[in-house]
């Protein structure tokens, strides 16, 4: 699963996923991409299961890009522990995905196969999504 090699702080403040993305709202590398239509935190397990779902549909010639990374740790206190006495320990890693963020991209396979791969990956993610085709600017 994805997680950072090292971080500046073990327990960051919660980062909001409200609002629209800045700069990651277009298909940059592949031909098709999957775009979040609402924001959410996506944990590393969901990203990994979506990656596996895409890679099973790609074959040998297909190419995939993961455009999100779980940089932020989420903390949790143990069960049956009273309130107070500090913040809990880091439990898992999440990527902050805002509305309009391109999460995965694929290329080098037939169009129907790309749509099928991204649709299967989208069902693994805890956000509402849509497919986006690359726009060629001439």
From Swiss-Prot:
GO terms for molecular function: rRNA binding; structural constituent of ribosome; tRNA binding. The keyword Oxidoreductase does not apply. InterPro entries: Ribosomal_uL16, Ribosomal_uL16_bact-type, Ribosomal_uL16_CS, Ribosomal_uL16_dom, Ribosomal_uL16_sf. SUPFAM superfamilies: Ribosomal protein L16p/L10e. Keywords: Ribonucleoprotein, Ribosomal protein, RNA-binding, rRNA-binding, tRNA-binding. PROSITE patterns: RIBOSOMAL_L16_1, RIBOSOMAL_L16_2. One of its GO terms (cellular component) is cytosolic large ribosomal subunit. Part of the 50S ribosomal subunit. Binds 23S rRNA and is also seen to make contacts with the A and possibly P site tRNAs. Belongs to the universal ribosomal protein uL16 family. This is Large ribosomal subunit protein uL16.
């Amino acid at each position: 699963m994805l997680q950072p090699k090292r971080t500046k702080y073990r327990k960051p403040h919660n980062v909001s996923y409200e609002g629209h993305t800045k700069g990651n709202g277009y298909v940059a590398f592949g031909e098709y991409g999957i775009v979040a239509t609402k924001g959410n935190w996506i944990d590393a397990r969901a990203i990994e299961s979506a990656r596996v779902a895409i890679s099973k549909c790609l074959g040998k010639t297909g190419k995939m890009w993961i455009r999100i990374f779980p940089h932020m740790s989420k903390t949790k206190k143990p069960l049956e522990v009273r309130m107070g006495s500090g913040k809990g320990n880091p439990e898992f890693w999440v990527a902050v995905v805002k509305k309009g963020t391109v999460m995965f991209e694929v290329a080098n396979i037939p169009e129907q196969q790309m749509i099928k791969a991204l649709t299967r990956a989208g069902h693994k993610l805890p956000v509402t999504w849509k497919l986006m085709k690359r726009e060629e600017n001439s």
